[in-house]
Amino acid sequence: MYYFVTASKDASIYLQQPSQNTGRDEILEISKTYYGNLKDISHSLIKFNTNSISQSIASGEITASAAELILRECESSEIPTDYTIYAYAVSQSWDMGIGTRFDEISTDGVTWSSCKTGQNWMSQENHSSDTTGSFNGKGGIWFTGSFSSQSFSYEIDK
């Protein structure tokens, strides 16, 4: 039996555009890119409403013991032949916002600097020891005890 759940909200946030919101963009970006000595990182945030799933598991309607997150690659360039993607639970609530990647840089909603318009991500010091984040409290704070990862390895055709 398959049970499909779509995201209730999503957005990408960018180190080099710390006040940009992409809550209405159709593309989620995950990257670590270097432009000479300049590093740019993008994180994607995805929220699922799990209340109905929890109720269906409790009632026995859903008996599956595993779940999958399916993301598709789109217009990628210069992907390394070996890499791993990690998924962590974000420790704060956040607002999706209404921006897209190429809108004005400042749009309401989640950004690298803030989880909601006018509300910065909490610093690491304000969280328990089972969370981590960037050194300056920007880019999100996430739980470290529970995560999922997927590694990819490609052989280049000769």
Regions inferred by a protein language model and the residue ranges of each:
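Secreted, disulfide-rich extracellular signaling modules
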Residues: 1-158
